[in-house]
Amino acid sequence: MDYEFLRDITGVVKVRMSMGHEVVGHWFNEEVKENLALLDEVEQAAHALKGSERSWQRAGHEYTLWMDGEEVMVRANQLEFAGDEMEEGMNYYDEESLSLCGVEDFLQVVAAYRNFVQQK
């Protein structure tokens, strides 16, 4: 999972992720927006879940972050519809709407993001 952090002309941090993980970048850009307290909450949840069967989720305005002890899923909230609403043969998976990654990989991105934000 490759990533890049940039600052736009106004100094706002933007995250770009590799193909297949774009939604993780959107989550940082739309939900985190340099809110380090949210990252603290996510890290605490990840540590609490380690080795357990439990899961945790944080719904945001545009994206929901879900995780268990091994995996993180970020999905666009617009994907919340019942299966019978989908046309037969249609798959709602879209690289721009859903992404999965391991907890350890995700926490590495969180730590790198935090370091980048604090370099102002």
From Swiss-Prot:
Disulfide linkage: none
Pfam families named in the record: UPF0231
InterPro entries: UPF0231
Family that this chain belongs to: Belongs to the UPF0231 family.
NCBIfam families, sorted: PRK05248.1-1, PRK05248.1-3
Protein name: UPF0231 protein YacL
